[in-house]
Amino acid sequence: MLRFTEDHEWLRLEGDVATVGITRHAAEQLGDLVFVDLPKVGTTLSKGAAAAVVESVKAASDVYAPLDGEVTEANDAVVAAPETVNQDPEGAGWLYRMRLADPSSLDALMDEAAYAALPK
């Protein structure tokens, strides 16, 4: 089940661990990514705080923590090959995984239909 934020991040929950990335819309708006900076494993994130940075030839953009939690894994493959985020933003282009402080907080995020209806 995918959930989305108004800042164009997505989450996929498996148990109490969420995989986080940017949406296809965000990747298209940024253009070709040339640099990705991810949070370190063990970092505690607060909802709305800058968690990662994605940089394209057009702009650099913060990726915000969608919920409170602790980083359990960073996708080093996208650091080595940032274009993966453009090619498969909601798959192989995921950014990091985090253990949610409160998995029920996921309910506050948008489902796919609500995200699709969001003005872009």
Curated annotation (Swiss-Prot):
Q: Which UniProt keywords apply?
A: Lipoyl
Tell me if Transmembrane is a UniProt keyword of this record.
Answer: no
- Where in this chain does the record put each Lipoyl-binding domain? 17-99
Q: Tell me the superkingdom of the source.
A: Bacteria
The cofactors it requires, by name, are: (R)-lipoate
Transmembrane annotation, as ranges: none
Q: Which GO terms describe its cellular component?
A: cytosol; glycine cleavage complex
Cofactor binding note from Swiss-Prot or TrEMBL: Binds 1 lipoyl cofactor covalently.
Q: Look up keyword Cell cycle and say if it applies.
A: no
Q: Name one Pfam family in it.
A: GCV_H
List N6-lipoyllysine occurrences by residue.
K58
Any one GO biological process: glycine decarboxylation via glycine cleavage system
Entry's family note? Belongs to the GcvH family.
Which PANTHER family does this chain map to? GLYCINE CLEAVAGE SYSTEM H PROTEIN, GLYCINE CLEAVAGE SYSTEM H PROTEIN-RELATED
> Which function does this protein serve?
The glycine cleavage system catalyzes the degradation of glycine. The H protein shuttles the methylamine group of glycine from the P protein to the T protein.
Q: How does it assemble?
A: The glycine cleavage system is composed of four proteins: P, T, L and H.
Protein's name in the database: Glycine cleavage system H protein
Species lineage = Bacteria, Pseudomonadati, Pseudomonadota, Alphaproteobacteria, Hyphomicrobiales
Q: Which gene encodes it?
A: gcvH
